[in-house]
Amino acid sequence: MRILYAEDERDLNDLVTRRLVAEGYGVDSCLDGQQAWDYLQAADYDAAILDIMMPHLDGLSVLKKLRAAGKTTPVLLLTARDAIADRVAGLDSGANDYLVKPFALEELSARLRVLTRSQFGAGDSRLVAGDLTLDTGTRRVKRGGAEIVLSAREYALLEYLMHNKGIVLSREKIENHVWNFDYEGGTNVVDVYIRYLRKKIDDGHERKLIHTVRGMGYVLREETP
């Protein structure tokens, strides 16, 4: 899942970004509201976390622009102000949730999970490819009924492949989504993690799901053995 995080306190921005990446999210982070709005215009996100008090453009203004543009991206607002009027203003502007600083990282993670579950809906939380299932709500992966334990990065890669089942994804797209890298070529991080996933997902199964498309990238699809 791809998350936008906008927070002008650099230390907090770095801390939260590291936490979300460790949990398997792809994260674009920025330090002011104008950058946040630029990101939101350029890409679709599974959720956005916006601080209210930011330079150039405050979080409420970003949120209003987002809703005026017809985008339904789930938004969690962050603020140091706990006044009821501030909460009402945020919710009236289209926020899905509201978190007051200082907050525990565990609470932020829990609220983000609720937001992303709500976006996909209870009936859409399971991604399926053959006998492979991934539950985005519980973050559990099974193949043939057997549970598969994945690292946070392996999970993020598999989720991206399954969301794009049948679509060939270039190394550049995978790096940008899963690692938040600006692709420069020469790195083999995608190939390494594809090998990790194949060992856990495909080894021991006659029907392989993760395929290499020479010169193009990788695709997850069902093929007859």
Task: Please tell me what each predicted stretch does.
Residues 1-122:
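N-terminal/domain-start alpha-helical segments
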Residues 35, 215-219:
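Glycine-rich nucleotide-binding loop
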Residues 54, 136, 143:
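Conserved A-loop
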Residues 71, 123, 130, 206, ...:
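Residue-level signal for beta-strand positions within conserved beta-sheet cores that form or flank
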Residues 119-138:
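CheY-like receiver
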Residues 140, 145-209, 214-216:
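Positively charged, aromatic-enriched patches within helix-turn-helix-type DNA-binding elements
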Residues 222-225:
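Intrinsically disordered, low-complexity protein-interaction/activation regions
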